[in-house]
């Protein structure tokens, strides 16, 4: 009987050949966006501290924020934060019973979360630039 169990286990665990459902992708990206947001808090607090330290510090922070690369990073941070908040609300709505916990409802809510995040990302781009 033990030999049958071993034969039924998956052999190929190459992640490039496994097709994740959209709900798994949404969950993984939620974790990634949380890590990005966590790291970004330190960077943003440093930038805030620099800008509030003195008039020269404010000028330095303004010069840093004037760079296209920094604006792009800021847009990425805001997009990650927006995604994390939107999908976090989705998870809370499922936990509180406001959304069905079926696979179809999960796929639908994940797609809606992606669309809302794209809209918020575009708004963040307008805000940054």
Swiss-Prot record:
Q: In which pathway does it act?
A: Carbohydrate metabolism; tricarboxylic acid cycle
Cofactor(s) the protein needs: heme
Q: Does the keyword Transport apply?
A: yes
Span-the-membrane segments of this chain are 27-52, 69-89, 109-129
Q: Has keyword Transport?
A: yes
Q: Which GO terms describe its biological process?
A: aerobic electron transport chain; aerobic respiration; cytochrome complex assembly; tricarboxylic acid cycle
User: What does the note accompanying the cofactor annotation read?
Assistant: The heme is bound between the two transmembrane subunits.
Mind telling me which Pfam families this protein's record contains?
A: Sdh_cyt
**What UniProt keywords are attached to this protein's entry?**
Cell inner membrane, Cell membrane, Electron transport, Heme, Iron, Membrane, Metal-binding, Transmembrane, Transmembrane helix, Transport, Tricarboxylic acid cycle
**UniProt xrefs under InterPro entries:** SQR/QFR_C/D, Succ_DH_cyt_bsu_CS, Succ_DH_cytb556, SuccDH_FuR_B_TM-su
Q: Where in the cell is it found?
A: Cell inner membrane
- Topology within the bilayer: Multi-pass membrane protein
Q: Cite the binding residues for heme.
A: 84
Q: Which residues lie on this side of the membrane: Cytoplasmic?
A: 1-26, 90-108
**Which loops or segments lie on the Periplasmic side of the membrane, by the record?**
53-68
The cross-references to NCBIfam families, in alphabetical order and at most eight, read:
PRK09487.1 (NF007021), succ_dehyd_cytB (TIGR02970)
What family is this protein classified in?
Answer: Belongs to the cytochrome b560 family.
The protein in question is named Succinate dehydrogenase cytochrome b556 subunit
């Amino acid at each position: 009987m033990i030999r049958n169990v071993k034969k039924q286990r998956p052999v190929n665990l190459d992640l490039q050949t496994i097709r994740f459902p959209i709900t798994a992708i949404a969950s993984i990206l939620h974790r990634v966006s949380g890590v990005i947001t966590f790291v970004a808090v330190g960077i943003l607090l440093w930038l805030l501290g620099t800008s509030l330290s003195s008039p020269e510090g404010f000028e330095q922070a303004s010069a840093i924020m004037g760079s296209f690369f920094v604006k792009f990073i800021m847009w990425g941070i805001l997009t990650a934060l927006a995604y994390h908040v939107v999908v976090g609300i989705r998870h809370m709505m499922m936990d509180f019973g406001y959304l069905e916990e079926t696979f179809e409802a999960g796929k639908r809510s994940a797609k809606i979360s992606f669309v809302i995040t794209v809209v918020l990302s575009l708004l963040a781009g307008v805000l940054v630039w």
